[in-house]
Design a protein with these regions (language model features):
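Nucleotide-activated chemistry modules centered on ATP-dependent adenylation/adenylyltransferase
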Residues: 1-268
């Protein structure tokens, strides 16, 4: 049997187990849909886990600054996948910590928008498609990650997780973040997307020698040099590249602690 298939099947099974565990243990769950490759895989896995239909809302915290292709993707597949789509706007930048660097401050609007959505809907669990290999701060995360009453993350106080034993009880008055693809890599995401024929936003594919490896707000996200015009070529490129996945994200190039400050305050 193809070893790649074995590996992807194992990843899929573990992620589906985590999704079902979260659904069984939490009363009011939602899946955060950023519209990027990772959260699209998350929706695909959730549809598989629950026999074709996602049984909890898909929450898009909208900055109003995404690429047009991302909004077109959301509108099409929100309907096609029959999602209970909740689109919640972010507040203006005036509501954000003014001591943050410019790009981080712009990105932090999502944190404030997420806090408003939590207050509005009362979710006790939020599923997010982050991965440990993306960024150093996310490498410190847990699969079931408790948040404080204001949505904050205490990086120094994370519960141990051994042998698939998870603490799936949210703190009083707070919520859990659930990360079912935390153990995946960027290459895993693309290999699975190819195998499952998951729809993608065309910005991920090269045009005129450029493509986006990571998608965010249009004003703080930039393409990288690439000739990869299909997923097979993306996978080959990833085997050789030394360029970080988030090289096109402006906030990752600001102060050394900017991203961790965002995540401690409740960012994804």
């Amino acid at each position: 049997m193809d070893q790649t298939m074995d590996h992807l099947d194992a990843l899929e099974a573990q992620s589906i187990y985590i999704l079902r565990e979260a659904f069984a243990r939490l009363k009011k769950l939602a899946l955060l849909w950023s519209l990027g490759k990772d959260s699209n895989v998350m929706i695909w896995l959730a549809r598989k886990a629950f026999f074709g239909r996602v049984p909890f809302p898909a929450l898009h915290v909208d900055t109003g600054k995404k690429f047009p292709e991302m909004y077109a993707f959301r509108d099409r597949y929100g309907k096609e996948w029959e999602l209970d789509l909740r689109v919640e706007p972010c507040p203006s930048i005036d509501a954000v910590d003014p001591t943050l660097p410019p790009a981080a401050r712009s990105a932090a609007r999502k944190t404030e928008g997420l806090k408003l959505a939590l207050a509005k809907f009362g979710f006790d669990g939020l599923i997010a498609g982050i991965r440990r290999d993306e960024e150093a701060t996310r490498a410190k995360e847990r699969v079931f990650s408790p948040r404080g009453t204001e949505g904050g993350w205490d990086v120094r106080d994370q519960p141990p997780e051994f042998w698939d034993q998870f603490n799936a009880s949210p703190p009083p008055g707070a919520h859990l973040r659930i990360h079912p693809i935390l153990h995946w890599t960027e290459a895993d995401i693309w290999a699975y997307t190819k195998r499952e024929n998951i729809p993608i936003i065309p910005l991920y594919l090269a045009k005129d020698g450029k493509r986006y490896r990571s998608l965010g707000d249009a004003d703080i996200t930039f393409p990288v040099t690439s000739d990869a015009s299909n997923i097979g070529e993306i996978l080959a490129e990833l085997e050789a590249t030394k360029v970080p996945e988030r090289a096109g994200r402006a906030l990752d190039h600001e102060t050394e602690d900017a991203f961790e400050r965002l995540r401690v305050a409740g960012y994804l």
